[in-house]
Amino acid sequence: MKSVLITILFSFSAFLISAQSINKTNSQGKRHGDWIVKHEGTSTVKYKGRFKNGVPAGLFIFYYENGMIKAKNKYFNNGKDSYASTYYDNGKLMSMGKYVSQKRDSVWVFLDKWGNYVAKESYKNGAKHGKCVDFYPFNPKFDQGQPKILEVMFYSNGELDGEYQKYYQNGKLLLEGNNELGRKKGKWTTYYPTGKKRTEIYYKRGVKNGYVMNYDGNGQLTTKQYFVDGYELKGKQLELHFELKKKRKQAESQGN
């Protein structure tokens, strides 16, 4: 009986010492040491982690009110950078990536609540930069455990810049083209699910500029239009445009 009482007293003393050593501040009033913060009005932990003179250091774990882990952040470089992962309330991984100076950086992966890929994105200074891939919602009946690519695109400082492709769920190409600083540029082509060309459109600074051609499922040209700065030219307007274009070329060749 005496040994049981000693054990209880020892455990209670250890608990008091532990309780007294958390949620402390330094002489400047900044959080320092281990901290455990609870959801307001509850006994459920909201987050726990360690501070060093007001700066998060090492692993922090955040929780939903149901007690499931919401996020994990592992801080380094004096709290400026971190590796982060977020979770659904069913425990499945939601996203994972890196922060540099508290902004998204490098490759981030996003998943749905069943663990299937949603997107894979590249970041720099908090903005999309580089290759980004979106995936179709996972369908276990048809996807055979493999994610199906919806779009592949490239960004520069948050703006679409470079190649772009969009795919049918069967993996065949649906659309392809190029962007320049957020605007469509040059030839954009769409395809039928069979792989045959459907449309061919030319762009300049994000608007139609040049021929727009439509094809049927057999690859035969059905309509052909011509645009300048987003406006369609027809009849006499179109004839005059090509006449002026021809004269400009002749003048340029004579000037050389």
Task: Tell me what each language-model feature is.
Residues 1-23:
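Bacterial Sec-dependent N-terminal signal peptides
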Residues 17-256:
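Glycine/tyrosine- and acidic-biased, solvent-exposed loop/turn segments at the edges of beta-strands
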